[in-house]
Amino acid sequence: MAFTLQLGDSAPDFSLPGVDGRTYSLADFSGSPVLVVVFSCVHCPYVVNSEERMLQFDADYSSRGVGFVAINSNAETTYADDGFEGMVARSAERGFNFPFLHDQSQEIALAYGALRTPHYFVFDGERKLRYTGRMDDNPRNPGKETTHELRDAVDALLENREVEVPLTNPIGCNVKWSGQEKHWMPAEACDIV
């Protein structure tokens, strides 16, 4: 059995608190023709160096109805900055316009099979998985990326085309699992590409 959601799988529902004081679920994005769910955090340099691109992606695609939501599932016992207070501070500091949600129980990370931060999951209007993996090929070095798989996938879905590259390996820090050492990953998690 695969650890990570497989192409064509339905988006698992969630009910998670956001840094804005609201609780969000899939229903909050029901009007979006495409939904992007990214597993993110506060401490990881791959995330930190991707935040401008996340903000730009949301700015470019929200006007086209694309939903974008970030979920932090990292155990704050590994990195205290990944706790809810750190999330609130980062969101305010960076000016996040998208929901930034806290998955303290890690149940949603397990349901999606999140491997790394950042790890993107793109769902069509029926909330079937059509792309999973990375945003681009160089999340740690802004301006040096040469591929843009997330944008390509979302563009394809908005234009009613098949996603040409539906699966890539996410590039980033591993999800920090409660009760495990900081570099631990489940053995079955090495199944994506």
Residue ranges and their predicted role:
Residues 169-181:
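A short, charged, Gly/Pro-tolerant segment at domain boundaries
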